Each structure stands twice: as C-alpha cells, then as structure tokens.
Amino acid sequence: MKKMKKAVYLILFSVLTANSQVMENPNTDMSVAPVEQLALTQEWDKVFPKSDKVDHRKVTFVNRYGITLAADMYTPKDAAGKLPAIAVSGPFGAVKEQSSGLYAQQLAERGFITIAFDPSFTGESGGSPRRVASPDINTEDFSAAVDFLSVQPDVDSSRIGVLGICGWGGIAIQTAINDPRIKATVASTMYDMTRVAANGYFDTDNSAEKRNAARASLAAQRTEDYRNGSYKRAGGVVDPLPADAPQFVKDYHAYYKTPRGYHPRSGNSTDGWNVTSILPLMNFRFFEYAGELENAVMILHGEKAHSRYFGEDTFKLLCGDNKELLIVDGASHCDLYDNLDKIPMDRIAQFFSKRMPAE
C-alpha cells in the first residue's frame, strides 16, 4: 500500500513539475496572452441612481480561461489606507447595471471597496458564444474577481468576500468552498441552479424519466443549433404575462420587464439564455463538499420567497458557528433584488465586518 501511495505521489509530482515548466515558457506567459478588448459604456446606465458617497469607475480583469470580465468598481469617497473588498454578481441572467450594482454601491457606502461584474458570455464581459452558462466557468469568474481585488493597492487582500444574488448566491457558496481566500460569503435570495436544472422547481421533475426526456430534447437542440450555425435562445422573463402565472413569475416580470429593473443587456429582460445552457447545470451538482467550508457564510431569504427552500437546505449542509441563516419578514424573492426597505444592508455589512476583521 505504501509503495502504491508513493507511486501515485511521484506521478502527480511529475505532472505538476511538467506544468510548472510549461508555465515558465515565455510563450505561455499570462502577461503576453492576448486579452479581449471590450467596448465599455462610460455613461451611467444603471437602473438605480448614482450615489454621491462613492467613486465609480469601470474595470476589467481576466479569468483563468482567458475571458475578460467587465465590472463596475465602487470605492468610498475619501477612502484612506487598505480597505476590505467584496465581489458581487447576480441575479442569474441579469447584468451588473441591475441588482448586483445596487448591492455593490450600497456596500461601498458602508466602507467596502466593491466590484459588480458581468459573468462570462454576458453583459459587457467577453466570451463567445453569448449567453452561455457554465457552473465551472462561472465559479471561476468569482475567483477571478478575487484575483483582481487581491492585487489592488487599496485593498486588504486578507479581507475579501463575495456576495451572490439569486442563482449567483449558490455559485458564490460553491466558489467559497474551493477558494479559501474568500473570507466571508453572502448568498441573497439564492437558487441552487444545478438542483433546479436537474429537478425542476420544487423538485417536481426529480425522476430519471423526466431528466432523460429533457436530455433527449436538449441533445436534439444541439444538433439543430449546429445545423443552423446559431444558438436558439430560451427567451427571458415571459412577456406578456399569462393569466395563470405564479406569483413569483409576476414578481420577476415586475422587475425585469418594467422601468424598475429593465436593462437592454440583461438576458432576463430580453431574449434569455441559449436553450442548451441548462445542460452543464443538469450534469453538475453544487455543495458536494459544503461541510468542508470553514469560512463564514450568511444565507438570507425573504419569508415569502419561492426560492427559500434552496437556502434552507443549503444551510443544513454547512458546518461551524460562523454560518447564519436570516429570513426577512414579509419579503418575496424579488424584494431582495432592489427593495432597500427589505434588504438588510446594514446586517450584511456588519456580517462582512465581523467575519473579515482587520489583522
């Protein structure tokens, strides 16, 4: 047994050494790798008003797959010294000009350097084809945001957190499991996108028969997309609303399809994801190692949120006394997108301050 272990370690070491030698080759140096040039809008085009308490600028950074991500950076006015930082993204299918930007700006008002970023293949970020979701690449997006924040001269690299909204709440927790640089994580009104993709809403499609039917349909769509040379879009939030739409669909419509939250770069506001984007989510499960997450997590949900079960079930998988579940009285799922009377922003800021103390 000892000989077998030694052989495995030797093989692993040789692979890692080979990779190290490749990275030392100037032809593979990240510093000379081609970087996507993004056309970024410089005017204020958010769905929320600009704060006079923070400074704002556009920034870009590159993830491990070479995709350039676009972000809005918010810095407290008259900031001095190194500050704690938070990367924000979500909801799933939204853009940084919507809910994530509001959270980022609000937290900057409370003393944090923040960025709200567009995930790969969406918004102003790079990547092709457009409107593709990937549980692997999207968790990498959050870690890439941490890469970027870690090297900023005004950021305390030992005090970096992440905040994910809706589907990006689950992605934030999954990233934190694998990235111990993330000292604290907040998942607001979270979805587990891998669960809903495989099992349907409220787990009503949780059977091999239904999943196999979905796989067959998506496989056929792949063939059709390849034949056509383009990707069929799934459509954003349904519009007009059917008379029998569930309340949570009405709530989505009230945000994404009205001046309250509509943005032309948002998939949810327009024509949605590529139909086949659901495939990798069906084939991947978050939170397999959730019990190993040592750093702090806060999960918050509205009392009336249809998505509440995602957060409560995920919370049960976490270990340690630095995990919190906060239920907001009377709030729906979408109330926690932009309703500042419902979003416990001070509690969120206090959580980050407590769990990311200055050393």
What are these regions (language model features)?
Residues 81-91:
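Short beta-strand element of the alpha/beta-hydrolase
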Residues 173-257:
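Alpha/beta-hydrolase-fold enzymes
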Residues 331-342:
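Catalytic histidine-centered segment of alpha/beta-hydrolase-like enzymes
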Residues 93-105, 119, 311:
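The serine-hydrolase catalytic nucleophile loop
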Residues 33-81, 337:
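N-terminal cap/lid segment of alpha/beta-hydrolase-fold proteins
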Residues 293, 299-301:
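Short beta-strand/loop motif that positions the catalytic acidic residue
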Residues 132-153:
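Alpha/beta-hydrolase active-site loop
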Residues 106-126:
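Conserved alpha/beta-hydrolase
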